[in-house]
């Protein structure tokens, strides 16, 4: 049986969820920024409402916090400090769309930095694990003991 549409009712069309839209725009910004910073800035120019800009920021903040969790402790602490500074920039631009756009670009740049740091940390960890495995194999064969004895005299 078809639904009865009453006068003044949209027939099931709903407004987009502002949080979901903010997350989508944040993802778009993160896709654009590494390749074309001008296009990334232009994508934010199309957002005029402070509320919508703040939802994009919420999306970026969620990504940044998630990315930072994968960093070594010292880098994670530095990332937390940078997040505090980004919060100060956001607060200073609370009602200024142009200032909020600058905040969003800086927040997106921070995420790119976090990803770069995470990738570097993963490479270093993999290298350390490889070195440790080689060292353990050498010790098991007695090679390291002979090498250590030769260098300690």
Regions found by a protein language model. Name each.
Residues 2-153:
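Solvent-exposed interaction surfaces and binding hotspots enriched for charged
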